[in-house]
Swiss-Prot record:
InterPro entries (alphabetical): Ribosomal_uS4, Ribosomal_uS4_bac-type, Ribosomal_uS4_CS, Ribosomal_uS4_N, S4_RNA-bd, S4_RNA-bd_sf
Lineage: Eukaryota, Viridiplantae, Streptophyta, Embryophyta, Tracheophyta
Record organism: Alopecurus pratensis (Meadow foxtail)
Identification of the protein by name: Small ribosomal subunit protein uS4c
Residue ranges constituting the S4 RNA-binding domain according to the UniProt record: 89-169
Chief location of this protein within or outside the cell: plastid
């Protein structure tokens, strides 16, 4: 299955808030609840929804998610926690969390168009796994800095997670350490994703 390109609000209505997918929010109204099936949710449906939340938030394909679950399963720590750490340390997600892009698809586009440097080298792979002490900057040209400047100016510095720091004057971000579970920007039960 390829990456989702369809209407984003449909996914948000179904799964809840997905800040990585879009900034849009559905209108609050009682008619939203009536459209969907009511009654008892089955275990399969709950697990599927949690998996879909993860997929759409991080912009992953089914195959990519399975690969991350497989890598996390080999780790000695909790599989769900390792899975979230792997996803949060992706370059496109770190750009989104630093405030250099409004959404994860926007961050993917910045990386694909070669506007981003990691430790002084151009990286054009959005799934690049960042490590602690990696320095993420924009290219030293006006166009690259202009793209990131608007997003940094509009981002809230209070929402910046503890494992990242940003220098807004030089358009530079630093990965301090691997993320803790409590700083993940998505309400999700990762154990249900692993069980699925």
């Amino acid at each position: 299955m390829s990456r989702y390109r369809g209407p984003r609000l449909k996914k948000i209505r179904r799964l809840g808030a997905l800040p990585g997918l879009t900034r849009k929010t559905p209108k609050s109204g009682s008619n939203l609840k009536k459209k969907f099936h009511s009654g008892k949710k089955e275990q399969y449906r709950i697990r599927l929804q949690e998996k879909q939340k993860l997929r759409f938030h991080y912009g992953l394909t089914e195959r990519q998610l399975l690969r991350y679950v497989h890598i996390a399963g080999k780790a000695k720590r909790s599989t769900g926690q390792v899975l979230l750490q792997l996803l949060e340390m992706r370059l496109d997600n770190i750009l989104f969390r630093l405030g250099m892009a409004s959404t994860i698809p926007g961050a993917r586009q910045l990386v694909n168009h070669r506007h981003i440097l990691v430790n002084g080298r151009i990286v054009n792979i959005p799934s690049f796994r960042c490590k602690p002490r990696d320095i993420i900057t924009t290219k030293d040209n006006q166009r690259s800095k202009g793209l990131v400047q608007n997003f940094i100016a509009s981002s809230d510095p209070g929402k910046l997670p503890k494992h990242l720091t940003i220098d807004t004057l030089e358009y530079k971000g630093l990965v301090n350490k691997i993320l803790d579970r409590k700083w993940v920007g998505l309400k999700i039960n990762e154990l249900l994703v692993v069980e699925y």
